[in-house]
Amino acid sequence: MKILAWLLFATSTHAADLVSHASAHPDGRAVFSFDASAWQSTDETRRMPVGVFDSGIGGLTVLESLLTLDAFHNDTLQPGADGTPDFAQERFIYFGDQANMPYGNYPAVNRTDYLRELIVKDAIFLLGRRFWSAEGKEPQFTKPPVKAIVIACNTATAYGLEDIRKAVAAWKIPVIVVGVVEAGARGVLESQAEGGIGVLATSGTCASGVYPRTITQTLGLAGKSVPAIAQQGSPTLAGAIEGDSAFPESVSAYALKEARALAEAYRGTKAAAPLQTIVLGCTHYPLAKNEIDAAFDELRKDAALRDLIAEKRVFVNPAEATARELFRELAKAKLRLKADEHCSIEQHQFYFSVPRVDETGVQLSADGSLDKDYKYSRAPGHLDFEDTKNVPLTPDLIPANSAKLVRERLPAVWKSLNR
């Protein structure tokens, strides 16, 4: 297995080591492992929930789309709404890696290998049964495994989608893996907007170049001309939306700063058409769409920027396209629940990561989160050490301003969280 893993992960030996580590502990009791015997039959697999993960609460925007999508007929599987949510019978397990967010900042400090390891660890958590209670001293093993993994994080998709797909292939398990970036590019194509394209994302996502590359490929394959594309990577906006104390200004203030930077980046393309399509290239950003849109309106009051920005912008949120892709993939693999079947869990489940405050060597900031210098100086390869633990997420654990955004803008998620 180790030789196979190294061949699959030629660019990341640490990802290969993690795949080998999980394979070496097939009972799923060890740290970063899962029960490899869980997927014994298609019938058993079909009754499993779907896993969704992000680096924090931003992926809840994707979960909202999954809970509310009505784009297919549930009986015929053909396109078209039928009045019933397309995933009404399915159940979801959501994981937000809150303790290690934002993922977009790791590449900027040369911690890409550690980021890739984190992303594969997220997948392993969803595949496994292992979790911690909020006050527990020992892990528990009653979380169900999943039949599909939705990477509801643009940075994680950019840096980890292929790693997870290769890992699933190496482990020989029938688990579907879907990411958000390709969906975002399809959203640009379907918008049919004529102006320029701006990508607002994290620093890490922008550094990867994945959106300009994927948008160009998608438009090109469809026989469409490719307009000017500019991008702006923010190290602050996702954290501000999360309510992280390290980012004390308002979400509106950070949104204005990033919108201005994107407009200036678009000016640099020297395109004749104004900036019209805004790709919300971080799953946190739909939670602040109103603030971002207002920021562009504010910028248009500046005569030097007015002609650079379209009066009416088109916002592309990759979440709905991701939900459509998951529906198609589950149907193709015959893993959608049948009309007379039920998932192995009755309700959706939510988890997030917190620092292990009792673990030797873990460094914390004054508010109890991981110390910033400690967080971004960690190295991969320590597969017997957990400085964070994954615990059930309840509404009271979400920062107040983030909870307000979820309650007001993601009603289906909020209802599920409060059951």
Please give the residue ranges for each predicted region.
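Sec-dependent signal peptide recognition
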Residues: M1-W6
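N-terminal signal peptide c-region/cleavage motif recognized by signal peptidases
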Residues: A10-S12
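Non-catalytic structural scaffold of enzyme domains
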Residues: A16-R419
